[in-house]
């Protein structure tokens, strides 16, 4: 059976469209509250990966009571302990959503959610920035 280039292109385009529709459908399942949580969580993640306690605390205030452990933290260690609690919620919230990846650091045995496929370890900070792997 021979398939013309035009039919093959049409099938490929239709397949891509279906994948995109499915991806957008998953993202649409997030409530506004979940989207806000994940946005603030990502800000905290980026700040902790950069060892920036002040920015992590500022982003945590956007989460109200959920972010209070980080907002009140006096050290990066304390902020990272609070972040671990948020990561459990982030994993549940982001499960099955397009654009979110669960990462794991085997050295610290910690998980987190991030939007990039390039590892940015919030638990190890600048000293361990690339330690971890995206979970499949």
Model regions and ranges:
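Intrinsic low-complexity, intrinsically disordered segments enriched in polar/basic residues
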Residues: 1-2, 58
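Bacterial N-terminal signal peptides that target proteins for export
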Residues: 2-13
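Intrinsically disordered, low-complexity terminal tails/loops enriched in metal-binding residues
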Residues: 18-136
């Amino acid at each position: 059976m021979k398939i013309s280039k035009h039919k093959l292109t049409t099938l490929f385009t239709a397949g891509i469209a279906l994948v995109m529709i499915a991806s957008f459908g998953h993202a649409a399942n997030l409530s506004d509250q979940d989207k806000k949580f994940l946005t603030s969580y990502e800000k905290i993640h980026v700040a902790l990966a950069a060892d920036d306690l002040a920015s992590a605390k500022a982003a945590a205030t956007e989460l109200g009571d959920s972010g209070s452990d980080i907002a009140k933290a006096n050290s990066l260690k304390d902020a990272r302990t609070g972040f671990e609690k948020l990561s459990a919620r982030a994993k549940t919230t982001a499960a099955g959503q397009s654009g979110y990846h669960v990462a794991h650091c085997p050295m610290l045995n910690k998980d987190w959610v991030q939007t990039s496929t390039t590892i940015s370890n919030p638990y190890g900070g600048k000293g361990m920035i690339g330690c971890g792997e995206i979970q499949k």
